[in-house]
Amino acid sequence: MRTLLVFLLLAILVAVLIGNIQVEACKDLTECSPYKLCIKGICERMIG
């Protein structure tokens, strides 16, 4: 019973962390550094 409770708490913690990462995704070009572009919510380096 105790291991099940620990497993559920860990699963909830992981879900919250994943949710926070998705919320912090970039939405426009101004959120990334000068040499990066916002592509599909992720700051990617410019090529070239």
From Swiss-Prot:
Residues 22-27 form a propeptide. The modification Isoleucine amide is found at I47. Disulfide bonds join C26-C38, C32-C43. It comes from Haemadipsa sylvestris (Indian leech). Leech salivary gland peptide with unknown function. This is Peptide HSTX-VI. Keywords: Amidation, Disulfide bond, Secreted, Signal. Expressed in salivary glands. Highly expressed in the head, body and tail with a 2-3-fold higher expression in the head. GO terms for cellular component: extracellular region. Belongs to the annelide toxin family. Does not show effect on voltage-gated calcium channels, potassium channels, and tetrodotoxin-sensitive sodium channels. Does not show activity on Nav1.7/SCN9A, and shows very weak activity on cation channel TRPA1. Residues 1-21 form the signal peptide. It is found in: Secreted. The keyword Signal applies. Transmembrane segments: none annotated. The keyword Secreted applies.
